[in-house]
Amino acid sequence: MTESKIAIGTVQFGTNYGVSNKSGVTPVTEVKKIINLAQENNIKYFDTAPVYGESEQVLGKCLNNYGEIITKTISIKNKVISEADIVNIRSEFNRSLKRIKRDSVYALLVHNSNDLTKKGSERLHDELCSLKDEGKIKKIGLSAYTADDIDSVISRYEMDLIQLPVNLFDQRLIHNGYLKSISEKG
């Protein structure tokens, strides 16, 4: 069986999220079933973030070293990124590692694409590169919602991966040719 590129989104493992979510946070017993089903189907990527409630803790409890974690940075509130913001990013990332019970993760995505276009964004990118050099992350990435967001970041910085809002129901970035064009760029 070939490795799947599908990632399981885990926001509902830790918080009551979603327009059609009528049952609240996914119980741990169900999370374990989802992880078992993922293993049976060679799905090994799990997407989480510090802002997803208890999601990271649930993954740390349930994964038992299976799979690859993709997590995200906290958003930077300031208009100009300072050294203090970078210290906060590093500290929160270290807390994420503790919550998921790992020494490293597959990828760290910048959760708010605007953080990579603000004044001082090179500090954030440099910190991501440092984490990669230290072996704490394998991939540097971006979570984005629009083609403009992606373009504004990749014109400044190289990204190993980009998380896009593409699913069975929302395929705008496929149909308008954008996904193909950025794929061709590498």
Predicted segments, located by residue:
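Active-site beta-loop-alpha junctions enriched in small/polar residues
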Residues: 11-13, 49-51, 72-76, 110-113, ...
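Beta/alpha (TIM)-barrel catalytic core signal, keyed to glycine-rich beta->alpha loops juxtaposed to Asp/Glu
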Residues: 113-186
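Acidic (Asp/Glu)-rich catalytic clusters
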Residues: 2, 59-69, 97-103, 132, ...
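Short, acidic/polar
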Residues: 22-38, 84-101, 144-153
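Structural preference for beta-strand elements that scaffold enzyme active sites
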Residues: 3-7, 44-45, 68-70, 104-109, ...
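Active-site groove signature of glycoside hydrolases
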Residues: 97-116
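N-terminal binding-site loop/beta-alpha segment at the start of enzyme catalytic domains
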Residues: 1-68
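Acidic-and-aromatic substrate-binding clefts and catalytic sites of carbohydrate-active enzymes
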Residues: 47-57, 77-83, 115-119, 168-174
